[in-house]
Amino acid sequence: MIDKKKILGDGIKKGQIPEHLYMYSSIDSAKKVLESSKLWMSSFNSFNDPFEFSFALNNDYTEEEFTEWFCNATKTNNRMIARNLFSNKEEVDNTIKKAIQETLKDYGIKCFTTNPNNLLMWAHYAKYHEGVCFKFDILKDADFFQDLLQVVYDDTYTQLNYIKSKNNTVEILRHKSEAWKYEEEWRVLKLGKAKQLVGFSRDSLVQIIFGCRCKDQVEIQKMCSEHGFDSVQFSKAEKANDSYKLIVTPLTL
């Protein structure tokens, strides 16, 4: 049996993955998380960036390799159709792109960050600093956090040779434009869980940081108590007096 916690722990010790991950949220979404102990897994085609999950096809494969792939993918042995298709590059590319999209649509994706103090993310994802930022200890829920990918930021699209290596398709899910580098993003992937709620361990939620404009502090604290989030510590983000940054300080109940 695979020891998921040990694998994550080894990755943390080697500096390959973070021990804690953060998730910004509006108050309404935060309440749903606390009520259900579940997180929404998005599908690849629901992201707000139109460049997200873009890729460039690497067509370095032979007619025979394409024919074998086509017959396997369509579960037929009609090699003549495959060879006729191979002569039309545009049709080949369209066929491959459809196959890639079929593969990607099965993955549920949840986005996290290693940075709980980013002004832009507080504004964008925590509704103008009125929301919260959740802090998760990944070792306290190895089942949820086992399939973890660090996002790679590039100026050019990922090159993908789907015919020779279908398994590399998942790389598309971890690449995005350099413009988003400030997000310091990590993603949890769940095969077969796109557009679904997936449960997480209450113990893994170890801190809630209230935004500097958050007015729902008491209600969120009450919900944590009512729904069994006993490990949560509370903090408050406040504007610094002399610089463009946030100061996070612990709260006492």
Region spans (language model):
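Partner-binding and oligomerization surfaces adjacent to conserved cores of proteins
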Residues: M1-L253
